[in-house]
UniProtKB/Swiss-Prot annotation:
It comes from Pasteurella multocida (strain Pm70). This is 3-dehydroquinate synthase. It catalyses: 7-phospho-2-dehydro-3-deoxy-D-arabino-heptonate = 3-dehydroquinate + phosphate. Pathway: Metabolic intermediate biosynthesis; chorismate biosynthesis; chorismate from D-erythrose 4-phosphate and phosphoenolpyruvate: step 2/7. Its cofactor is NAD(+); Co(2+); Zn(2+).
Length: 362
């Protein structure tokens, strides 16, 4: 088992990474008599709910669960209310612990419930998708979507522990593994050129779910994110760099309707758009852009805009992005491979040109 610590100003919490951790009582910071509400979805429940429940019952915990519908389209206030109702019906107080057992959607909704219920209760993340393990479970971002924008209603609320059992990746569809690799590639592109090069050498084994390389990869991503979050917990500086490709990607998700493309698929195209824009600004070479495009393609990720979306469709969505200040776009771009920065007041015409370069030719 590996352990990465997230060091915050006022406290720290561990990320445990290893095989078989769902059944390891030592990973759960709970004691006999503690009340627990597990939040999960039907897909994950059939694989892992009884395993986690049995582990907690052995510790003497009082365990209940709520099962939410599966998919990004259910990351809503309605789902949040289902959690609140279950907590209230079970007479859960401020001393309860909410456990998110699932992917990014479950983690985000359960985390926001933990932040909101009785003004805050303890929260444990057990991410079961690659994307959640390397990204959304770490750092305390919680949210639900609105019809007009992704993650528009939420809070920064840190878990007390993150438990990453790599065995859960064995039950994932290939498409979910590939979507998670988009966020993995992002870390190398923004902050770690040696890691990007390592990915170029090992991407095929990651697609094939080699357990040793996956554990190495997850630990590296968690360490990069932990370091960034330690410097900037509430995204007032460096943490924004973690959003490479996300402004473009969120536009895709919002325009198509949540759930049509996976988050990682949209981010993959968004990263390439950001790279093309960076090349047009004179930061990257065409070879740099080609390296990123090739790596995304080897991870079986899309590299062109959805064929139902026109370049002009992007900007209205992008202008609702949370990084927009005074009505002006702020985009995460690349100064070089392995070094990102936040660009302010980028010419919208140049942004549109970069989007066109990544648009499918019919």
């Amino acid at each position: 088992m590996l352990c990465v610590n997230v060091e915050l100003k006022e406290r720290r919490y561990p990320i445990y990474i290893g095989s078989g951790l769902l059944s390891d009582e030592k990973c759960y910071p709970l004691k006999s008599g503690d009340k627990v509400m597990i939040v999960t979805n039907p897909t994950i429940a059939q694989y892992y709910l009884s395993q986690v429940t049995d582990t907690l019952v052995k510790k003497g915990c009082l365990v209940e669960h709520v099962v939410l519908s599966d998919g990004e389209q259910y990351k809503t206030l309605d789902s949040l209310n289902l959690i609140f109702t279950a907590l209230l019906q079970g007479n859960h107080g401020r001393d309860t612990t909410i456990i998110a057992l699932g992917g990014g959607v479950i983690g985000d909704v359960a985390g926001y419930a933990a932040a909101s219920y009785q003004r805050g209760v303890r929260f444990i993340q057990i991410p079961t998708t690659l994307l959640a393990q390397v990204d959304s479970s770490v750092g305390g971002k919680t949210a639900v979507n609105h019809a007009l924008g992704k993650n528009m209603i939420g809070a920064f609320y840190q878990p007390c522990t993150v438990i990453i059992d790599t065995l859960t990746l064995n039950s994932l569809p290939k498409r979910e593994i590939n979507a998670g690799l988009a966020e993995v590639i992002k870390y190398g592109a923004i902050l770690d050129l040696p890691f990007f090069t390592w990915l170029e050498q090992n991407i095929d084994s990651l697609v094939a779910r080699d357990p040793d390389n996956l554990q190495t990869c997850i630990a590296r991503c968690c360490q990069i994110k932990a370091d960034v979050v330690a410097r900037d917990e509430t995204e007032k500086g460096d943490r924004a760099l973690l959003n490479l490709g996300h402004t473009f990607g969120h536009a895709i998700e919002t325009h198509l309707g949540y759930g049509h493309w996976l988050h990682g698929e949209a981010v993959a195209v968004g990263m390439l758009m950001a790279a093309v824009l960076s090349e047009k600004l004179g930061n990257l070479t065409k070879t740099d852009v080609a390296r990123l495009e090739r790596l995304l393609a080897r991870a079986n990720l899309p590299t062109v805009s959805p064929d139902t979306m026109q370049p002009e469709d992007y900007l209205p969505h992008m202008l609702r992005d949370k990084k927009v200040l005074a009505g002006k776009l702020r985009l995460v771009l690349l100064a070089s491979l392995g070094q990102a920065y936040v660009a302010t007041d980028t010419d919208p015409a140049l942004v549109l040109d970069a989007i066109r370069c990544c648009t499918q030719v019919n």
